Regions:
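Short hydrophobic secondary-structure edge segments in sensory/regulatory modules of signaling proteins
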Residues: 8-12
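Conserved hydrophobic beta-strand signature of PAS-family and PAS-like sensory domains
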Residues: 18-20
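PAS/PAS-like sensory domain cap-loop motif
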Residues: 26-37
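PAS-family sensory/regulatory domains
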Residues: 36-52
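Terminal output helix/cap of sensory domains in signal transduction proteins
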Residues: 48-82
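Beta-strand residues that line the small-molecule/cofactor-binding core
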Residues: 80, 85-87, 104
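Short loop/turn elements at sensory-signaling interfaces that couple input to output
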Residues: 89-105, 111-119
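Sensory-domain boundary/capping and coupling elements
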Residues: 115-133
Length: 133
């Protein structure tokens, strides 16, 4: 499933971290076509050195009795199709079923700040990041 909105990138993953939705903005920002990522685990986006930490947090969030739908906004390192790691502003939106049980996660990304500029957001995994490119 895709759409034609490219002002933001949106990705929806299920409880197992499998990509279920990928919009045109995600294809534009990250360089991966929807046909290549829908149905796959989201590992391709996660910087390899951060994968273990990412999956620990993701699985813990999805295993909760009730999901917290309010999540902080931050710059997240993303592995683009070109192999370049870029930092994109990211908001997680936890998806709950009708009984407030975890059902998945929506990730909404904005365009990265221009080189040498800051958007004022903190960086996820700051101890391992390189400056934005």
């Amino acid at each position: 499933m895709t759409d034609t909105t490219s002002a933001v990138a949106m990705m929806l993953v299920d409880l197992d971290g499998i990509v279920r939705f990928w919009n045109d903005g995600a294809a534009e920002f990250f360089g991966y076509a929807a046909a290549d990522v829908v149905g796959r685990p989201m590992d391709f986006l996660i910087v390899p050195t951060h994968r273990e930490r990412h999956w620990t947090g993701f699985r813990a969030a999805m295993a909760r009795e009730r999901i917290d739908t309010e999540q902080p906004v931050a710059n997240a390192p993303i592995t683009c199709a070109s192999g370049v790691i870029r930092h994109f502003p990211l908001r997680f939106v936890a998806i709950a079923d009708p009984f407030d049980k975890p059902a998945g996660m929506l990730a909404v990304f904005g365009p990265p700040p221009a080189e040498g500029e800051s958007n004022g957001l903190y960086y996820l995994y700051p101890e391992a990041l390189t400056p934005p490119v």
